[in-house]
A protein has these predicted regions:
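Bacterial N-terminal signal peptides that target proteins for export
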Residues: 1-11
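Internal, hydrophobic beta-strand segments that form the core of beta-sheet-rich folds
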Residues: 158-160, 259-266
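Bacterial N-terminal signal peptides
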Residues: 10-18
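A short tyrosine-centered beta-strand micro-motif
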Residues: 86, 245, 257-263
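Glycan-processing catalytic domains of CAZymes
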Residues: 197-199, 204-211, 263-266, 272-635
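Extracellular and organelle-lumenal recognition/adhesion modules and their flexible linkers in secreted
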Residues: 23-248
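Surface-exposed, short loops/turns at beta-strand junctions within beta-sandwich domains
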Residues: 251-257
């Protein structure tokens, strides 16, 4: 989503004038439309203010018409501060409001930018669940920003709707509230569960310091820790950027046991600007947890290497519907399922006995999400129920991870961080798994999960031409997490038309066999250490041509399974040159053989040279969407 930019001049003038409409210094500001559209901008003359149409008979902003456009938004800008957390809310009401003939909802979206108008991020507000049963037609939409990044000065609020909307929509009583300020969002480590017994460990901090008040060159940050002799030590970051401070330490140089490795940021004259810590534990030997990750991001289950290869699936099974597929799911090709809904212990054990592990979804009890069950829609009730579930199931060997994030908004960060800490305390044997479709948000969320997945679904999504996001997104995620989080990617095994029946798009279809194989191999070449496709039900539904994708998906998974030994090998040599339009990953097998997976990320033929450190150049020719596993010859052999 690309929001309309605010000009640098207008932002600067607003700041200098005190910005009567701003909230950088105010705790909360409420705005109605009693002064018409003063202070608001729009590009559609159909926006107006109607007296007595608002809540309690007040004024309301109204749009009425046909075939509206998202870009024809009613927009207003507010001054904000870097590091601040802001909650935005508005009341909305619709009358005969549809999109392509189907009832739809209005949209509240917000973007934040720097003083030059550079876009820094955005979020969409959600309808507050408690208002679904309202009787007067007014519903409340609310969203919360993350701690705003360094350089953020402006928050732009847009009241709008999706393209193709028709009917009437009304808005009233906008509120902007500053909740707090977090100059350091978090400090995290590169080690699973923030513990280790050998090698090195990286500590990374996400900075959100107001660099207008505290220019980077005036700051003196240090990481503080207790060393192996018991003395307090400190070291300057090896990497210091406007939004990041990082350092690498030897685990052996840390005191044994648990301690806080703390980042303290001071000014040159000694004033403390901010501090935050990562609890880290130096162990005496390798942890013996049921599920763990090694330094290469590979999963180990019960002491054996494990490459997740599975699907999102229904919860408990309808025997009549799934009987024809059960044998195909338990014949050794797939090894895990992620039931999207509550699943019984009996089902978990049934699949475990057949060699299929369960990634247990907690999404139905996650506070602040639309899928949360009604009885658990407070933060306290949500955490209490999840604690109960995990305590009940944590001894089940068939469970390999807890699924806690399903394309969550940034407003969920504090809850997910608390949830991860709770899960680590209750169950030391399993990781926390998160999936998102927002690569630009990954760094904000990085401290809330142990293993991450991106779910790019390019086929039929906005034309389906740019299939390369199947590798670009995981590459972005790896960079955003400092290459410190394992990755279980989510390939597309469904037809977008099933989700968007209001759209007329001839590209809506189930992925062809070559597309599906390409997306899977792209993900692996980009660094994925597992695949959990969305979704199994999608492979069994009939497409427009009357076929299903189950057979082609099963064939591709069988091919992938035949190469799992390669995918679980140690990393190979660095790639210095690759053909344009490709993504490449190398491995070194136990016998010393080096192999490379080369994937064409385009819908055109590609060719060029592949050069890996210490190995002879290889000529590559791949057809559109093609891929190949090739052996590399060491120089001098």
């Amino acid at each position: 989503m690309q929001l309309t930019r605010v000009s640098a001049v207008s932002v600067l003038m607003a700041i200098l004038s005190g910005l009567s409409m701003g909230c950088s210094g105010k705790k909360k500001q409420n705005l109605d439309f009693s002064r018409g559209l003063e202070g608001w901008t729009h590009r559609d003359p159909r926006w107006r203010v109607e007296a007595t149409s608002g809540r309690s008979g007040s004024e309301a902003a109204v749009w009425k018409g046909e075939n509206g456009k998202f870009a024809e938004q009613l927009k207003r800008s507010f001054a904000v501060e870097a590091g601040g957390i802001y909650r935005v809310g508005v009341w909305a009401k619709t009358v005969d409001f549809t999109q392509h003939g189907v009832a739809t909802k209005p949209v509240l979206c917000c973007g934040y930018s720097d003083r030059n108008g550079k876009y820094l991020g955005s979020f969409w507000a959600n309808e507050v669940i408690d208002n679904i049963s309202c009787t007067d037609g007014w519903r409340y939409f609310e969203g919360t920003t993350p701690p705003l990044p360094s350089g953020a000065t402006t928050l732009s609020v847009s009241l709008t709707f999706r393209d193709g909307a028709s009917g009437t929509v009304l808005f009233d009583d906008l509120s902007i509230e500053r909740l707090g300020c977090e100059p350091i969002a978090y400090v995290t480590s590169s080690r699973y569960r923030d513990e280790g017994f050998d090698g090195t460990v990286d500590f990374h901090a996400l900075l959100q310091i107001n660099l207008v008040k505290y220019p980077l060159e005036t700051l003196r940050p240090v990481f503080r820790y207790t060393d192996a002799s018991g003395k307090e030590s400190e070291v300057s970051p090896t990497v210091l950027k406007p939004n990041e401070a990082s350092v690498t330490l030897r685990v052996a140089d840390l005191a044994k046991g648990r301690q806080d490795v703390r980042l303290v940021v001071r000014t040159a004259d000694g004033k403390t600007v901010a501090e935050a810590a990562c609890p880290f534990t130096r162990l005496s030997n390798m942890p013996q947890s049921h599920v763990r990750f090694d330094g290469h991001g590979r999963t180990w289950v019960g002491g054996k290497k494990f490459f997740p290869l599975g699907f999102y699936s229904p919860g408990d099974w309808d025997p009549k519907r799934w009987a024809p597929y059960y044998a195909q799911l338990t014949n050794g090709i797939i090894n895990c399922l992620l039931p999207y809904r509550e699943v019984s212990v009996e089902t978990i054990r049934q699949f475990d006995a057949a060699g299929v592990k369960t990634i247990y979804s907690l999404r139905e009890w996650l506070w602040g999400t639309r899928c949360c069950k009604r009885d658990y829609r407070t933060r306290e009730a949500s955490l209490a129920k999840i604690r109960e579930i995990v305590n009940e199931l944590k001894d089940e060997p068939g469970i390999v991870a807890w699924y806690v994030m399903d394309e969550a908004p940034l407003s969920q960060i504090s809850f997910l961080a608390e949830l991860k800490e709770m899960l680590h305390q209750i169950d030391p044997d399993r990781p926390v798994y998160a999936v998102t479709d927002k690569p630009y948000d990954i760094r904000q969320f990085a401290a809330t999960f142990d293993v991450v997945g991106m779910d790019p679904y390019p086929v039929g999504n906005h034309g389906g031409a740019k299939i390369d996001i199947a590798s670009k997104w995981p590459i972005q995620a790896a960079e955003a997490t400092w290459h410190s989080r394992p990755m279980w990617q989510v390939p597309q095994t469904f037809n977008w038309w099933w989700e968007r029946k209001t759209e007329v798009n001839p590209e809506h279809r189930f992925p062809r066999r070559d597309e599906l194989a390409n997306m899977c191999y792209q993900a692996i070449a980009a660094g994925a250490n597992g695949l959990v496709a969305f979704d199994l039900a999608g492979t069994t539904r009939k497409d427009k041509d009357g076929t299903t994708g189950f057979v082609r998906t099963r064939e591709i998974y069988q091919e992938l399974k035949s190469r799992i030994d390669l995918f679980l090998s140690n990393p190979g040599p660095a790639v210095s040159t690759m053909p344009e339009g490709t993504v490449v990953r190398t491995w070194r097998r136990d016998d010393g053989t080096v192999s490379a997976l080369v994937v064409n990320t385009t819908r055109s033929d590609v060719s060029g040279a592949l050069v890996c450190k210490g190995h002879e150049q290889k000529k590559i020719d791949l057809p559109a969407l093609g891929y190949a596993v090739i052996d590399l010859k060491a120089k001098g052999n």
